[in-house]
Amino acid sequence: MNLEILTPDKKIFSGDVYGVQLPGIGGIFEVLGKHAPIVSALKAGKLKILKDKNATSLYSIQGGFVEVMNNKATVLVEGVKES
C-alpha cells in the first residue's frame, strides 16, 4: 500500500508500507493493503506507520482527514511531528 502524509506546508512521508494506524474520531483504526475505499476524520493523537510486520514509525498529529482509495492512503493533517 502507498502512504502519503501531507501538511499545508510540505510532504512529511511518501512510500510503500504494510499499513497505518490512525486516531479516528471514534477511536483508533488500522488500514492495511487493499482496504475498501474510505474517507475519515482524524483527531489529534498518534499515527503509527507499519513499514512491515516488525518495523514502525510514530508521529504525533493534529486533526485532519484520511482518504483510502486504490491501495493508496493519503493523510492530510494540520500539523505533525515525529515521535
Place the predicted regions along the sequence by residue.
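Compact, glycine-rich, soluble single-domain proteins
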Residues: N2-S83
